[in-house]
Amino acid sequence: MESRLLQGGTEGMSGVPKISVAVPVYNEESIVEELLRRVLAVLDSLPGGPHEIVLADDGSSDRTWSMIEQAAARDPRVVGVSLSRNFGHQAAIGAALDHVTGDYIVVMDGDLQDPPEVISELLAEAQKGFDVVYVIRIKRKESMMLRVCYAVYYRLIASLADLDLPVGAGDFAILSRRVCDLIRQSPERQRYLRGLRTWYGFRQKGLEIERDARHSGNSKYSLRRLVRLALDGVFAFSVLPIRLATALGAFVVACSALFAFYSLIVKVFFGHSPEGFTALILAITFLSGVQLLFLGVIGEYIGRIYEEVKQRPHYVVKQVVRKTNSGA
């Protein structure tokens, strides 16, 4: 199996490659038509084909899925994958990747903040021998609050994760077939795509672009979801939180030993014990809070282990729509 997976990379690829674009969408009825128009226009400009766009609908409650169905019925290049409920952004990306057929796979969000016109540049770089070409976002056009949150998020991941994750790089990237297959076969229940593609290695390169403003509607990434994504990145690729708990525990033990030694000296040589009832209460309260915090950290790791051992699927597909070239 491993030898098969390592085939189909960038080295030695002959002929004109087929391109697949994998896009997760959720309640994007105001964007779907423009998204398809721009992506298909880019695919039309590329040699070879037939290329395709695979849209994974993550349990939308608006007209997103019906619009995808209509587009897929008209155009064999459009493939729709409907999930049975909302499984989350990363799961929807996984669903799209599981249905692509291309030699190179572009992963991008459906809000058009990642300009589809960059796909041709990504492909050109990938054909120079790179298995992954990821986009580094510069000059983001979101609100100041979101820009600050994203800046904190990227630096948190870079400092805590046991990977050299590039700052500013999101999910927008082009993958070789072998990297795509490796990600697809990853058994992790809670995948963190940008971490996985870095972990697998191979030749990678970053491409800086200026990110567009959202085409319409509101961002589906709330502060809570952004925090959740950051935690996924940290807990999936680092044991540093556990090590911090160990280090802090050792520090507290050392401080306690020093204070006990100090109390003994004061008692022996001065005949009384150090006073400080308020300080004692504050110390107990502080240490209790620290203990609860790190119990939460340990609980997070245990909870993720629990999710892994249940072996539930990453997502459940309700329907797939794909028109064949014969019109069937």
Question: For the regions a protein language model found, what residue spans apply to each?
Answer:
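Structured catalytic core of nucleotide-sugar glycosyltransferases
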Residues: 2-142
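Residues in soluble alpha-helical coiled-coils and helical-bundle/repeat scaffolds
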Residues: 26-30, 113, 117, 184, ...
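Residue-level signature of catalytic and energy-coupling elements of molecular machines
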Residues: 39, 96, 111, 133, ...
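Acceptor/aglycone-binding surface of glycosyltransferases and processive sugar-polymer synthases
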Residues: 79-85, 89-99, 104, 116-196, ...
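Solvent-exposed polar/charged
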Residues: 73, 98, 124, 128, ...
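Hydrophobic helical membrane-anchoring modules
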Residues: 2-18, 192-328
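Short, conserved catalytic or interaction motifs in soluble domains
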Residues: 85, 110-112, 177, 209, ...
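Short conserved micro-motifs on helix faces and helix-strand junctions that flank
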Residues: 24, 83-85, 173, 246, ...
